[in-house]
Every structure is written in C-alpha cells, then in structure tokens.
Amino acid sequence: MTFSEILDRVGSMGPFQYLHVTLLALPILGIANHNLLQIFTATTPDHHCRPPPNASLEPWVLPLGPNGKPEKCLRFVHLPNASLPNDTQGATEPCLDGWIYNSTRDTIVTEWDLVCGSNKLKEMAQSVFMAGILVGGPVFGELSDRFGRKPILTWSYLLLAASGSSAAFSPSLTVYMIFRFLCGCSISGISLSTIILNVEWVPTSTRAISSTTIGYCYTIGQFILPGLAYAVPQWRWLQLSVSAAFFIFSLLSWWVPESIRWLVLSGKFSKALKTLQRVATFNGKKEEGEKLTVEELKFNLQKDITSAKVKYGLSDLFRVSILRRVTFCLSLAWFATGFAYYSLAMGVEEFGVNIYILQIIFGGVDIPAKFITILSISYLGRRITQGFLLILAGVAILALIFVSSEMQLLRTALAVFGKGCLSGSFSCLFLYTSELYPTVLRQTGMGISNIWARVGSMIAPLVKITGELQPFIPNVIFGTMTLLGGSAAFFLLETLNRPLPETIEDIQDWYQQTKKTKQEPEAEKASQTIPLKTGGP
C-alpha cells in the first residue's frame, strides 16, 4: 500500500484538504505584496535640482533638457545675469542642495534621494531583497529536511512579520536593505514549505487544481497591492501594512499538520499515526483512522523507511543520468522564468502608463493565464504546457524590439501577454518540479530550482543597464534566454496522472519505462516492414 492509498482511506479530498489548502493559500496574498512592493515604495517621481537658497524659484533659473523640462541632475552655477562674463552664463553643476520632487507619494527614493548619481541604489535595494530569497532557498530547504516542514513554515511567517515591520522603521537605506534581505530569506522558507505541504496532502487527481488555487492567491495579491498603495502613500506605513498580517498567519499555521512523508522518513511513526487519525476524524472517516496502526504504516511504507536511512544531499541531484537531466532542464526553465518575469513586472514605470492601472492590468492577466495553464497541465500535460509558455513569452519579448516607443499601447499589450505567459510558467514549474523530484530529494530540488529563479531575478536589473549601449540589447537577452528555457522543458518526463516518486530508484524505473514505451512502437513498426521482391512471378 502506497501513501496515496493510505491518504484515500482517511479522506483524500475532504474538508481537511479544503481547509489545509486555504490556510496555505491566504499568506500568498502577502507574498505577492512583498515581491512587488518596490514598484510603489521605490517609485522615482519627476524631479529637478533645488535652487540655491538665495535663488529665484522661477523655471528659468534651472537649465532645460532636450524635452524642454528642467534638467533632473544639473543646475546653473550662477543665476542668469547679463553682467556676468559670457563663458560663465551657461555653466552648470550637480544638485548641491538636493532635489524637488513633483509627487505627493513618499518613497525611499524621495526620502534618501536615490536619484542621479545614486539612482543605482534603488535597483540595488531590490537586488538585495532577491539575494535574500536566493540565500533562503538552500538554507530553509536544509532546515526543512532536518526539522520538518511545519516548524519552518511557522518561523518563516514570524521572520517575515518581524523583519518586514522593522524595515518600516529603518533610519537609513543600509538598515532598510538588511531587513529587506531577511524578508527575502523568509519568503523562500514560506514558498518551499507551502509547495511541499500542498502536494503531499492533496491527491494526485486534484494536485493541479490546488496548486493553481494557491497561484491565484498570488494574483489576487497583485490586485490588492495597487489599491493599498493608493490608499497609503507613505512608504513606511505601506511597508508595515503588508508585513503585520504575517503575525496572524504564524498563529494560524499551528493548525497545519506536518508532512506525513517527512514524519515517516524521520522515524516518527506515532506522531504520523496521530496526524492521520486527526485528518480521518476531520474528514468524517474516524473509523478508518482508528483501524490504522503503527505496524501497518511501517509495513506499507517500508521502502520509504529503508531509503530514508541513506542521507541525500546536493550531489545526489547529479548522481544518475535522469536526475542530472531533470536538474539541468528545470534549472534553465526556472532561471529563464525568473529572469524574464521580473524584468517585466518591475518595469511598470517604463511603459509611460499610470502605475496603479498598469499594475492592476499586470495582475489581471494572471487570471486567464493561470486558468488556461490549469486546463493545459490537466489535459495536455506539464511538459508541453511548460515548453510553450516560455516560448510564447520569449516571442513576445523579442517582438518588443520591433515596436517603437511611441506605440505605447502595442508595447504594453506585448508586455502584458509576456507577463501572463511567465506567470503561467511559474504556476506550472512549482507543480512540475515537485512531481519530478523524489521525496528524498524533493525539498533539495525545490531549493536549487528556487535559487536559479532568484539568480535570474537578480541579474535582470543588471541586464537592463546594457540598454545604455543599445536599447534593443536587453530584450534580445531576455527573449533568447526565455526561448532556451522553453526548449529545455521538452526534454523532461511527463508527470500527468502519475504518483509522486518516493526514491531515486522510482524515478529511474519511471525513466526506463518511458524509454521502453517509446521503443516498442518503433520495434513493432520495423517488424511489420516487408521487403519488396525484385524477381518476377
């Protein structure tokens, strides 16, 4: 008897699973807010140099740029005065007395003057946040395998609540970056534990639906953020607003049960049995739960218990050929998705459209995108869906090269389409990755995959700097990498309607069966080929 069959006995999709998925999904609303928070807390408004204290405030005091507006980073050394020598009339200097910002919003940019020579610090703040997610992946992955999924989930909620709230009271940009780094670390812990606890407590037949439901919560979070940002124009209060709720989520997480697979593989059979019986009671199958015994769990999951005695680590992802292929292809797909997604999602200001409206549109496209994704992964399969989502996104990004900046509507439409494809790609990847790696390596595999997505999101701002050389270079890089990620997906195994692999041997057997299935039609076709006679009758 497999774990899936044991889950069927206690209720594979009953009231427990609905409440379980709900408790895991609600905090994802806040994760979306944190990931995209700097769209609003780090907005760069129109600005120009503050004139010297003794200068007139008339517009002519400031030099004008090519667009007829005051220069953002320069001012005249001397006030225009006919009595000055001609060679000093047009002399300019940097903004020695600060800047004037044409905005009612209070952001980290306006508070710490992250403009002109300091404008790269704004991008650095976002990169530091992504670095936190990058570091948090392997750290919390290892801690989760050692101490369990549930305690790491709870502590990650607390860390995000504490560090996010502390960031709201930061006295300097450096302190702000430190707390944002910790926010990123905690988000990795939440994401990884949520994915594992979802797929391990939900039956195979509804796994795609539950995963997409959690993905939709991220979409709803994208709707909530612009409304919240519009209502709370002060960045400190906005930062505090999106962080405080995680104190409540940490309390609710105590109800979430530990992964049965982890309990069994860790030798905690009595706790695993009590957890299953509690689930059975909640699902109205108390009698079935009482029939289960520790001996039955040990007997039916003996294969898993034996494999648990062997310690697995990062090197095991490359030990056998099929795992090397899975790791390489998934890493490329994750990198491409994170790389391109955050180049579009964090570039809302670049399209010349109201950022509140455009963020709602960017969030809204996820609804049809994820709905189409769930239909596709449920009927066409994970591999085809993953491949085509990335290829379509790559085509949309490359198409931006040929659309002039004056055609804002078309450029925005292509960006929205590409972002929708990449959102669907994330939804598919979270499910696909958890299904491809065996239980003994699932958390490690998810951690490595998460790392590559975050590496991509960290590199994306640096790639945008290449646009100073030629405007089309960033889109060439983003689009090409996305096409490569989509192509890699076609080299993976299909997981549609298959139980989760428990051990490395399971995925090896699965790979051999797939090869054999492909070879049989070819052999049959060859055997049916009849050579033509060359002689006469």
Curated annotation (Swiss-Prot):
Residues 33-123, 172-176, 234-236, 349-354, 405-411, 493-537 are extracellular. It is found in: Basolateral cell membrane. Residues 513-537 are annotated as: Disordered. It comes from the Eukaryota. Disruption phenotype: Mice appear healthy and are fertile. Exhibit a loss of taurocholate, estrone sulfate and para-aminohippurate transport in kidney and of fluorescein (FL) transport in choroid plexus. It catalyses: estrone 3-sulfate(out) + glutarate(in) = estrone 3-sulfate(in) + glutarate(out); estrone 3-sulfate(in) + 2-oxoglutarate(out) = estrone 3-sulfate(out) + 2-oxoglutarate(in); taurocholate(out) + glutarate(in) = taurocholate(in) + glutarate(out); dehydroepiandrosterone 3-sulfate(out) + glutarate(in) = dehydroepiandrosterone 3-sulfate(in) + glutarate(out). Glycans are attached at residue 81. Functions as an organic anion/dicarboxylate exchanger that couples organic anion uptake indirectly to the sodium gradient. Transports organic anions such as estrone 3-sulfate (E1S) and urate in exchange for dicarboxylates such as glutarate or ketoglutarate (2-oxoglutarate). Plays an important role in the excretion of endogenous and exogenous organic anions, especially from the kidney and the brain. E1S transport is pH- and chloride-dependent and may also involve E1S/cGMP exchange. Belongs to the major facilitator (TC 2.A.1) superfamily. Organic cation transporter (TC 2.A.1.19) family. This is Organic anion transporter 3. It comes from Mus musculus (Mouse). The lineage of its organism: Eukaryota, Metazoa, Chordata, Craniata, Vertebrata.
